[in-house]
Curated annotation (Swiss-Prot):
Protein name: Mite allergen Der f 6
Family per record: Belongs to the peptidase S1 family.
PANTHER family reported for this sequence: PEPTIDASE S1 DOMAIN-CONTAINING PROTEIN (PTHR24276:SF96), POLYSERASE-RELATED (PTHR24276)
Peptidase S1 domain sequence ranges: 50-279
Signal peptide: 1-19
InterPro entries for the chain: Peptidase_S1 (IPR050430), Peptidase_S1_PA (IPR009003), Peptidase_S1_PA_chymotrypsin (IPR043504), Peptidase_S1A (IPR001314), Trypsin_dom (IPR001254), TRYPSIN_HIS (IPR018114), TRYPSIN_SER (IPR033116)
Function: Protease that shows specificity similar to chymotrypsin.
Any coiled-coil regions, as ranges: none
Keywords carried by this UniProt record: Allergen, Disulfide bond, Hydrolase, Protease, Secreted, Serine protease, Signal, Zymogen
Native species: Dermatophagoides farinae
Amino acid sequence: MIKIFLVTILIVITVTVDARFPRSLQPKWAYLDSNEFPRSKIGDSPIAGVVGGQDADLAEAPFQISLLKDYLIMKRHMCGGSLISESTVVTAAHCTYGQKASSLSVRYGTNQRTSSSYGDLKVKPIIQHESYEQDQTQTDKTIIILPNPVVPSTNVQMNEIETEDIVDGDKVTIYGWGLTDGNGKDLPDKLQKGSMTIVGNDRCNEKWGSINAIHPGMICALDKTQSGCNGDSGGPLVSANRKLTGIVSWGPSKCPPGEYMSVFTRPKYYLDWITKNIV
């Protein structure tokens, strides 16, 4: 039976403060049997990140951010995201659903998960798409406003939203600090990247349509050996000309996914909403 992931959040207090991945901390991919979707009968499933990827230089993704969650006496990586203006980050709604802005921070200007010479910025308002529902995959996007604008530099740059058509067969790249092994527990310290190929929505819907219909606000990508899952949520999928093409949203329970596509929110489709809320 086909299983897919949807995301829920569960915070569990624990005394673990080392580099091990706290599975209970992050928005967790959970599986739903095909005949249950999109109901909220959720169960745990193994989680993963940019599986099969490689280290990414900061120059490749100076727009990448780490969304951090206050966790006991420290901050822990929860999701990825992209700077789209000096004061605005775009990420996935499932990363911020139910979260208080006061408990979140943004780390930027680094490809090292655990350090940045720029410091971390507390999150100001969270602007979640008004149509988003926790147990569904549509409108999976949130805008985060920073209290102070970042200063653009070699290491800190904004990512422009891709407005050109991205079609079946186009090459794209995913970035993130998610787990690199579906059965692992350790997050990589260095940003990872993975190459994927766009799959047209019609073909993607042939795989997913009976479980969760693919609509124009989604974009699909596939590589049988590389993919993004938990820990990469909210992070960027970029086109060959380095523009923001997708926001990591959901995918199959197996990582890497084999013949099932990873599914991303398509920023171009929601450009009016993003433009209205950008600072």
